[in-house]
């Protein structure tokens, strides 16, 4: 059974870590089902503090990816890819947002710059399974924060070299580990980042 036609072009799915009947879905908006997919409702709008038709920085949504973590089952994380016109050019960028207590907050905003640029196919996002504040996402490179409450998002990989290859398609943390490594599927294969390794190191 498919969901309402309004919700077509779904690209992201995630189950709530502590409730197998609750499913999140994303495409150009974000949705929730609390009954195993029988009915769906939006998780955005003014009542949630995140209006997809009026995003900060005038970004127009292209695609959204989502993820969850067992470290904070009530949280939903979103990677919102968009575009905007700047100086007669179309520039890609993204917001990273967290839904908690029925309210979204944007924790990171970034626009394409140099070799760090966005595309529809490079939209990986992952959160540590043991630390809900360790958030990482990727485009051509890995970007992240080891603690979103105190550490600004920054580059966590080179463009190419030193164990890493550009253009990231997937990010997955090791499960059932006290200090999990981050695995990265990219155009060069699979790269692995160990922690703690700030900045571009650890690959």
Task: Give the location of each predicted region.
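Beta-propeller blade termini and top-face loops
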Residues: 1-203
């Amino acid at each position: 059974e498919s969901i309402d036609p309004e919700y077509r072009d779904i690209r992201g799915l995630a189950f709530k870590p502590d409730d197998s009947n609750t499913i999140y879905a994303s495409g150009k908006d974000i949705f929730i089902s609390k009954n195993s997919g029988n009915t769906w409702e939006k998780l955005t709008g003014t009542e949630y503090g995140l209006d997809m038709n009026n995003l900060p920085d005038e970004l127009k949504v292209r695609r959204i990816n989502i993820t969850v973590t067992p470290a904070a089952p009530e949280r939903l994380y979103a990677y919102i890819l968009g575009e905007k016109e700047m100086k007669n050019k179309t520039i890609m960028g993204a917001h990273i947002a967290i839904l908690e207590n029925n309210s979204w907050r944007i924790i990171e905003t970034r626009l394409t710059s140099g070799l760090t640029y966005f595309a529809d196919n490079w939209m990986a996002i992952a959160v540590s399974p043991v630390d809900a504040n360790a958030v990482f996402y990727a485009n051509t490179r890995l970007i992240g924060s080891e603690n979103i409450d105190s550490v600004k998002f920054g580059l966590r990989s080179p463009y190419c070299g030193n164990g890493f290859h550009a253009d990231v398609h997937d990010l997955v943390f090791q499960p059932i580990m006290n200090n999990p490594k981050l695995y990265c599927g990219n155009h060069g294969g699979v790269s692995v980042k160990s922690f703690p390794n700030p900045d571009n190191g650890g690959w």
